[in-house]
Amino acid sequence: MARQQRRGRKVKKNIPNGVAYIQSTFNNTIVTITDPNGDVVSWASAGSTGFKGAKKGTPFAAQMAAESAARQAMENGMRQIEVMVSGPGAGRETAIRALQATGLEITLIRDITPIPHNGCRPPKRRRV
């Protein structure tokens, strides 16, 4: 049998500022915090924080995901972030407020939602 390789301990990086990407869809919210180069420091989603099904799309689930990602980033020494928001979901504003409430200083908020110049046909309207 092959001998298992020993892995070194995870190195704690000291990254004072970074970028938070909030991808908010109708079904889920994903928060990714990177360093200025774009290397991921921490991430969390509504699904990874324990929500299932339709509850993943709620603002409260987005808040919990943002808090979880921010806590991990602050353990790596992060203090300032720029926020890039993408998507039409319910958790956009709530996730930004949650990042602010954890003690991270937000220096910039930018909406990077892609807008089509009449691209794909949108899904048909729901009839309930």
Swiss-Prot record:
<keyword id="KW-0689">Ribosomal protein</keyword>
<dbReference type="GO" id="GO:0005840">
    <property type="term" value="C:ribosome"/>
</dbReference>
<comment type="subunit">
    <text>Part of the 30S ribosomal subunit. Interacts with proteins S7 and S18. Binds to IF-3.</text>
</comment>
<dbReference type="InterPro" id="IPR001971">
    <property type="entry name" value="Ribosomal_uS11"/>
</dbReference>
<comment type="function">
    <text>Located on the platform of the 30S subunit, it bridges several disparate RNA helices of the 16S rRNA. Forms part of the Shine-Dalgarno cleft in the 70S ribosome.</text>
</comment>
<dbReference type="GO" id="GO:0003735">
    <property type="term" value="F:structural constituent of ribosome"/>
</dbReference>
<keyword id="KW-0699">rRNA-binding</keyword>
<protein>
    <recommendedName>
        <fullName>Small ribosomal subunit protein uS11</fullName>
    </recommendedName>
</protein>
<dbReference type="GO" id="GO:0006412">
    <property type="term" value="P:translation"/>
</dbReference>
<dbReference type="GO" id="GO:0019843">
    <property type="term" value="F:rRNA binding"/>
</dbReference>
<keyword id="KW-0694">RNA-binding</keyword>
<dbReference type="InterPro" id="IPR018102">
    <property type="entry name" value="Ribosomal_uS11_CS"/>
</dbReference>
<comment type="similarity">
    <text>Belongs to the universal ribosomal protein uS11 family.</text>
</comment>
<dbReference type="InterPro" id="IPR036967">
    <property type="entry name" value="Ribosomal_uS11_sf"/>
</dbReference>
<dbReference type="Pfam" id="PF00411">
    <property type="entry name" value="Ribosomal_S11"/>
</dbReference>
<dbReference type="GO" id="GO:1990904">
    <property type="term" value="C:ribonucleoprotein complex"/>
</dbReference>
<keyword id="KW-0687">Ribonucleoprotein</keyword>
<dbReference type="InterPro" id="IPR019981">
    <property type="entry name" value="Ribosomal_uS11_bac-type"/>
</dbReference>
